[in-house]
Amino acid sequence: GGLWKTENNGNSFTPLFDDQASMTIGDIYADWTSGTIWVGTGEVNSSRSSYAGTGIYKSTDWGVTWTWKGLPESHHISRVLVDPNDSNIVYVGVLGHLYSTNPERGVYKSMDGGSTWSKILYVDDNSGAIDLIMDPSDPNILYAASWDRIRYAWDFQEAGKGSGIHKSLDGGDTWIKVSALDSGFPDGEGTGRIGLTIAEIDGQNKVFAIVDNYNRRSLDKKKDDSKLDKDKLRVMSSKQFGSLDNDKLERFLRDNEFPDKHTAESV
């Protein structure tokens, strides 16, 4: 666990975080110009062996010294983002407790380099932020993925109505859920973990999402009543069979992989 640094292309590593109060890391953010590193602690995979963290930490000297910056009840931090135009503006995705509900989850924002935090996106005490991305052309445009999950000693509920994708156009002041039922994205009790990314394609920034989906597929596809099937054939009288349209019978034979020697004319 912890955070490690290499200065020789991976031939050797030096631990940077061993003296801190957490061995599990959820996400890191490094500013290669200033030497500032942010570490969000706590593993987010939510397995039985996923250990909780102790909040978020900041170093301004490439990890030589660290300052704890709060969010002690976050337990599992999924993402740390920093505004490229103002390093004092920091966004943190907080997944929250694994084995219990708690209110310290969602998306948090700091305007003063981590001295204070405001919760800017909250779904419920069971749903936290599992991913968070920023539009590369506009840092005020944010997308957050919430995950409705809780683990018990005997069970893992890994999907729920609290899971979804949320979008902000104003730096997190307001949000809209863009994965609502009419959006085409899975939404409901079976929606699980979601991963997000954004990429420029043909001059436009496009968002991609991967989802662990347990929602049942809709069975509202209308059945073609005019098509001959085995159930109809089973209850058909000899007279009805004799009056069958040859095209319909031929299609039945081919759909059911009868040998080519059996045709509508021959049967």
Identify what each model region corresponds to.
Residues G1-V267:
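Beta-propeller blade termini and top-face loops
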